Amino acid sequence: MKQIRFLVLPFFLVLSILFAFTSAPKTKTVVFFGDSITQAGVKPGGYIDVLNQEIAKKGKSSQFNLIGAGIGGNKVPDLQKRLATDVLAKKPDLVFIYIGINDVWHYTHPCCKDKAGGTPIAQYEAGLKDIISQIKESGAKVVLCTPSVIGEKPDGSNAEDAMLEQYAAISRKVARETKVKLCDLRTAFISRLKEQNTENAEQGILTSDRVHLNAAGNRLVAEQMLAYLK
């Protein structure tokens, strides 16, 4: 009887250790790669902060490590330059790419229209494909986001609407051709603005200044991205 007991106890001990290792999910490293919107996303009330709060509500905080990698003024060529150090070095499991606003806005923005300006659309497309290719080669998955808004008038009369639509269309095309998931923020923003911006205001519904997100805008982005955190 004692011999059986000595055999059974180690058996159950091994089983419990194996169960502990197999039942504990791996912590996923998620990097958010972008411009000033993402740079602000890590601050209290920013969309990355909101995502952390939502994950905590579901009791999944230990399953995700969310890292912001946003720098103000960045465009696609800037992301290409810092991809290795700011994203790949983090060994991510998933990367959200939220870019495109400055690639359009800098054609007209006082800061830049007489300097480098925006990003030519062919360069924008090629740059996105290059970034995605390198991330996929590292073994990480990608969610490509469309650029959201430069101005909140839902009737299409914002100065940059036509060009921004072209760049958003390129982002959708790139996601389709590279077979990565698409988070269509522009469509989500326009839909929400058609519901809530009944006075055709230029700002103040989802942004504080036509571009950078207010509390409602950060919540909307977090809502759209949350579905991809599985």
Model-predicted segments: where are they?
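Bacterial Sec-dependent signal peptides at the C-terminal "C-region" and cleavage site
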Residues: 3-27
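Intrinsically disordered and other compositionally biased segments
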Residues: 6-8, 42, 78
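Flexible interhelical turns and helix-capping residues at alpha-helix boundaries
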Residues: 23, 41-44, 59
